[in-house]
From Swiss-Prot:
Stated name of the protein: tRNA (guanine-N(7)-)-methyltransferase
Pathway entry: tRNA modification; N(7)-methylguanine-tRNA biosynthesis
Species name: Mesorhizobium japonicum (strain LMG 29417 / CECT 9101 / MAFF 303099) (Mesorhizobium loti (strain MAFF 303099))
Single annotated GO MF: tRNA (guanine(46)-N7)-methyltransferase activity
GO CC list: tRNA methyltransferase complex
Length: 233
């Protein structure tokens, strides 16, 4: 996407690098070497065919935004070696965990971005992704902060641009207000069709779902996760 075509970020929340607890020396070493090997270079033009980004032959490319500690992304990348996966995680501690995992088990079908997800979305060519996962994003529970949620009209427009027709946007959350928010925004957008045949569908985990530590905590605390799937028209 050319600079003049990019949506303005003046009214958007910035999803840039964040740090929590100090990373251990071993994690810091894995982070440095891992990012050298797996990080995408957004200063270069994006290839017209994203499959060329990977060190192995892949048939499709998927994106996961905010992969946390990487449990789901790692599981999917191992499960589907002929699919290329791009993972975004601006939280340094989460990226360090992921880089520790791939140091122990290298993955030729993985690339990562450790900064603002919207910059990556604007870098990608149109109709280049076979799917987007947004799993347990920051819910910004206070109503005055809802405008900071990642699901927004401008970001759904980004999703619509980069997803291939028929590709799926999957969203999981245990926060009812965010689930309703996402349903309303996606149904209002026009480019997405909610894929749910019956009421129970949106409480049924995705096929092959490995679960995450965050999800397990939510269930222990009595919150019921929802799993939404939207198809790009």
């Amino acid at each position: 996407m050319s600079p003049q075509d990019r949506p303005s970020r003046t009214t958007e929340a910035f999803f840039g690098r964040r740090r929590g607890k100090p990373v251990r020396p071993q994690q810091a070493a894995a982070l440095e070497s891992g990012l050298d090997a797996y990080r995408l270079d957004l200063t270069a033009d994006a290839p017209s065919d994203l499959r060329t980004l990977f060190e192995t032959e892949v048939s499709a490319v998927r994106l996961e935004i905010g992969f946390g500690g990487g449990e789901h992304l790692l599981h999917r990348a191992i499960e589907a070696p002929t699919t290329g996966f791009i993972g975004v995680e601006p939280f340094v501690n989460g990226m360090a965990k992921m880089m520790m995992a791939v140091r122990a088990r290298p993955l030729a079908n993985l690339r990562v971005h450790d900064d603002d997800a919207t910059r990556l979305l604007d870098w990608l060519p149109p109709a280049s992704l076979g799917g987007i996962d947004l799993l347990y994003p920051d819910p910004w529970p206070k109503k005055k902060h809802w405008k900071r949620r990642f699901v927004s009209p401008v970001n759904l427009e980004r999703f619509a641009r980069v997803l291939k027709p028929g590709a799926k946007f999957r969203f999981a959350s245990d926060i009812d207000t965010y689930v309703n928010w996402t349903l309303l925004h996606c149904r209002a957008h026009g480019a997405f069709a909610w894929q749910a045949a019956e009421a129970a569908d949106w409480h049924r985990p995705y096929e092959g779902w490995p679960g995450t530590r965050y999800e397990a905590k939510a269930i222990r605390e009595g919150r019921r996760p929802a799993y939404l799937t939207f198809v790009r028209k």
